[in-house]
Amino acid sequence: MPTIDISIEDFSKLIESDHLLTVNELDNLISFAIAEVDSEPDGPDENGHTKISIDIKTSNRPDLWSAEGLARLVKGNNGTLGLPDLSSSPSDYKIIVDPETEKVRPYIAAAIVRGLKFDDFLIKQMIQIQDKLDYSYGRKRKRSSIGIYNINMISSPIHYKMVDRDFEFTPLNFENNMSIKDIFSNHPKGIEFGHILSKSKKVPILVDSEERVLSLPPIINSHDVGRVTTESKDVLIETTGTDKETVLIALDCVTQALRDRGGAIESVEIIYQSNIEITPQNTPKEIKINPKIINSYLGTTFTNDQIITFLERRRHNVVKIEDELLIKYAPWRKDIHHWVDISEDIAMASDYNTLIPTIPKVVTSGKISPSSEDENMLREIFIGMQLIEVMNYILTDPIILSNKIDKPMNNSTKDIVEIKNPITSTFSVIRSQLLPILLSFESKNTHIEYPHKIFEIGEVVKNIQKNLLTKTHAAVLLTGSNETLETILSVLDGFMRLQNLDYLLEDTDDKMFISGRRALIKINDIPIGKIGEINPSILNNFGIEVPSAGLEIDLTKIPNLRIKEYDTNKL
């Protein structure tokens, strides 16, 4: 969880306190913001600031990772109710986005903040929020990164475009021009973050209409335009990244913090090839709740007016609509997805300590299910064969289940269940088999000394005539110079012997395996799985250069196991 440094004197001013807060008062106030004092304060420094560390207890509220964000929420509990100001005035500034950036770092957002009074303390606070958002929320600048510039040195329109690595400019804190190639090799930030752009021949830069370089995102600002000093009053803030929501929220967090410091926000027009967007976000998001359901969930008897007051303390606007309440919340509240999230805000605003715990009416004791007992027994068998268990996500990339195994996404993959609203294509389908997943896992571990002997036992889901059948499969993958059909057959034979089962092998045309070195596994004339040496073309698709052999078994079809399939539609 993030830890931030604040000044007690500064925080007291931000929340408009009529006195200097004590450490205990500060700790009590920020507890409503899911935070606590992390250390004893140092004495006042030469500028009169008593610094203290604050531990933020939530990872999904990046708007709280600054003194300004904490103060904004605390002011709600102190009587400043409802949504913070989200307004912005239009500016003359535009950013034109080159379509080439889509392949590397496709999203950008920006805002202008005017009328600031920068001193050394405020610059350090600004750097702190920038660093916290870049490292934690932005995943060390991979998902998003923030740049701040002196807007008075920048001419519109700004261009976000791709350039060759031979392109030169003067990076921050350096005196001479350097090529981007040299920045990656010799500049501290280039060495630290250059890997983010390592797969691209060209890299993104920001330049203004007079070809002045603003920055090389997400690596380093330029020395001239990309430097904010105590003489700066008006700044441009931009965020770039690979995830649009992350980029927009990171911008919101910084601009809102500077608004709380007295800055006036102006919007920037982002011109993509196919559309135009205005940032920062200034429209609240909405969700409806039923107060009766909230009270039932929390075990409370709050009136509608009480609930409205609690929500306004948490900086929401509330509108009554018949028996429901329409909640309007800030666009940076990415943690709100469901009425349960709103109930959490109500509970915090009312004070968790006032909620009365109740003993459950039904007392039950849990135990391991028969199917889990059998799965664990099978795991012990495979481990006894010196196989290593791996556990992959049940959501996966459709390419792994199609193109990588030479089955394009068409009728041949109609059993694959797709997610309607995936966050990313990497997790957009539910796995329908395990062996391709193990091959993908193997492709990421080719640097480890061979042989590799891995297995997985887990659920798969198949779409069979619109019935979503959830099954439990077991798969084994052996990779090494000596792994053949014979070695994987020894695993199958040992498995079947320990289960006291007879089985048959029949020829199959499964293209995952080499012709003549593959088979269908049957028990009582019922197909239960497949086995064989992996086809070299499949191995090549995964970037595996060592022979591999594998098997996959549907455990729900083995008669003496208590592992059953179930129809998800009927749950």
Where are these regions (language model features)?
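TRNA-recognition modules of translation machinery and tRNA-sensing kinases, especially anticodon-binding
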Residues: G79, A110-T279, T283-E286, I388-L571
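Extended, well-folded interaction surfaces typified by the phenylalanyl-tRNA synthetase beta subunit core
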Residues: P2-P44, G48-A110, Q125, K142, ...
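Extracellular ectodomain segments of secreted/surface proteins
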Residues: M1-P2, P280
